[in-house]
């Protein structure tokens, strides 16, 4: 999983996740807990659901694992009662999961 930034009409890689994440799925991009983020899952290997965001204090991208070994196929984000929520179709373990994030 890599993040590219467009500078002077050219995309350059600015971040690469340190682990292999085969068969990526479950993509959401938008605000998450008040910050721009991307949520990406993968269905092979470790099969994690991961949130990627920019850490302003450390001036670098960071990855936070939301769930492990779940094999997500799709995610949906919504807000309820002021909390960010993700619904994930964790296909590889035959589960639909609700995550409340803070």
What are these regions (language model features)?
Residues 1-102:
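Beta-propeller-forming repeat regions
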């Amino acid at each position: 999983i890599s993040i590219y930034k467009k500078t002077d009409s050219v995309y350059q890689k600015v971040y690469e996740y340190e682990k292999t994440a085969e068969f990526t799925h479950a993509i959401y991009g938008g605000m998450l807990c008040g910050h721009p983020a991307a949520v990406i899952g993968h269905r092979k290997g470790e099969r994690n659901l991961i949130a990627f965001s920019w850490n302003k204090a450390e001036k670098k991208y960071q990855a936070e694992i939301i769930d492990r070994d779940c094999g997500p196929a799709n995610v949906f984000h919504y807000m309820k009662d002021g909390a960010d929520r993700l619904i994930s179709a964790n296909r590889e373990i035959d589960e639909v999961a609700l995550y409340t994030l803070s």
